[in-house]
Design a protein with these regions (language model features):
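Outer-membrane beta-barrel domain signature
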Residues: 100-102
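Sequence/structural signature of outer-membrane beta-barrel proteins
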Residues: 95-97, 133-134
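Hydrophobic/aromatic beta-strand elements that line small-molecule binding cavities or substrate pockets
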Residues: 74-79, 92-94, 110-116, 129
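Juxtamembrane and targeting peptides
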Residues: 1-4, 19-23
Length: 146
């Protein structure tokens, strides 16, 4: 019989799978159900932070405008679970077909998800996506692969 932590980890992994499905479907309403209303997101594009669910969804909606078809992949997800707080980290890649028909492989980012158990549901209260940067040039390094 699985422990409570094992059950919670399975639920969190299901939430991450739902993120992938929501992105692929460009389903803002589906994505909205996965985040706390007061989510704080540190994404790869400005500003430094997106505060609140509306800001997070606006950021996703903007990203979706670039794609005719969009794909999202998560690799090497590691999850650590507490009683009502959990975090996970992984590599993620947004790719697909741009509006002009050009296929893009996208770029791999480092991602962190912080979850809180609210009303028996694991919701994302913070997420972060980043790329390493070259200290000498100050530019992000976007061609690395896991």
């Amino acid at each position: 019989m699985p422990t409570q932590r094992e059950e919670d980890e399975a639920k969190i992994r299901q939430q991450v799978d739902k993120i992938v499905g929501g992105i692929r479907a460009k389903d803002l309403e589906g994505l909205k159900r996965l985040y706390a209303t007061d989510v704080v997101s540190f994404d790869v594009e400005p500003p430094l932070q997106h505060v609140g669910i509306e800001a997070k969804l606006k950021n996703w909606a903007r990203a979706f405008t670039f794609f005719q078809d969009v794909d999202y992949e998560v690799r090497d997800l590691t999850v650590t679970v507490g009683d009502d707080v959990a975090f996970g980290h992984a590599f993620g890649r947004l790719s697909g077909t741009l509006r002009d028909g050009t296929a893009t492989n996208g770029m791999w980012v480092r991602g962190t998800f912080c979850f809180r158990k609210l009303d028996r549901n694991w919701l994302i209260v913070h997420d972060q996506a980043s790329v390493p940067f070259d200290i000498a040039s100050g530019k992000g390094v976007t061609d690395l692969e896991p």
